[in-house]
């Protein structure tokens, strides 16, 4: 058995009245059966973040580091690549055309 913070992870059968997370639902093992703690509920789905709503965000594409002493044109190209990666990942709002 190993412990992850306060959660115990084990391939063995649970102890009587131990609280476990099972398939996203909190349960305890009592008299040989799993008992659900709390009511039945739908799983939570994290919404996408928008300019007005907090939510999950996607990971942006990697943009490599600039070389030391890079020319201004190279810096401008790299900054534009970063902005593009943020927009493609829906982290930044697209330009209005």
Swiss-Prot record:
Taxonomy, superkingdom: Viruses
GO BP annotations listed: symbiont entry into host cell; virion attachment to host cell
Matches recorded under Pfam families: Phage_head_fibr
Keywords, sorted A to Z: Host-virus interaction, Viral attachment to host cell, Virion, Virus entry into host cell
GO cellular component, as recorded: virion component
InterPro entries on file: Phage_B103_Gp8 (IPR022741)
Coiled coil: none
Protein localization: Virion
UniProt signal peptide: none
Main location: virion
Cited function: Forms short fibers at the surface of the viral capsid.
Subunit structure: Homotrimer. Interacts with the major capsid protein.
Name used for this protein in its record: Head fiber trimeric protein
């Amino acid at each position: 058995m190993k412990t992850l913070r306060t959660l115990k992870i084990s391939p063995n059968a649970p102890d009587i009245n131990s609280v476990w997370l099972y398939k996203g639902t909190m349960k305890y093992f009592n008299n040989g059966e799993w008992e659900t703690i709390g009511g039945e509920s739908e799983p939570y789905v994290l919404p996408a973040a928008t300019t007005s709503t907090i939510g999950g965000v996607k990971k942006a594409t990697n943009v490599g580091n600039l070389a030391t002493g890079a020319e201004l044109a190279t810096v401008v190209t790299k900054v534009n690549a970063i902005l593009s990666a943020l927009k493609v990942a829906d982290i930044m709002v697209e330009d209005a055309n």
